[in-house]
A protein has these predicted regions:
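Key DNA-contact positions within bacterial/archaeal DNA-binding proteins
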Residues: 19, 29-33, 58
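A short, Lys/Arg-enriched interface patch at domain edges and termini
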Residues: 63-66
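DNA major-groove recognition helix of helix-turn-helix/homeodomain DNA-binding modules
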Residues: 44-61
Length: 66
């Protein structure tokens, strides 16, 4: 199942590499790659990515669409 998200767009706007986002979020670069391709991930992983991109949890819809 594909999940719509703006992770790649936001990451590129912030001039971040996948490796840098992965390091800030505490996940692997492979995980970032899978998420950017639209693969499903755990809620905790989404939380880490939202915070690493500089958003608050209340702004989660700007990063991940349900």
């Amino acid at each position: 199942m594909r999940v719509k998200n703006n992770v790649r767009k936001i990451r590129e706007q912030r001039l971040m590499s996948k490796a840098e986002l992965a390091r800030l979020a505490g996940v692997s670069p492979v995980t970032i790659d899978r998420i950017e391709r639209g693969e499903e991930c755990r809620m905790e992983t989404k939380r880490k990515i939202i915070l690493a991109l500089g958003f608050s949890l209340s702004d989660k819809d700007k990063v991940f669409q349900e």
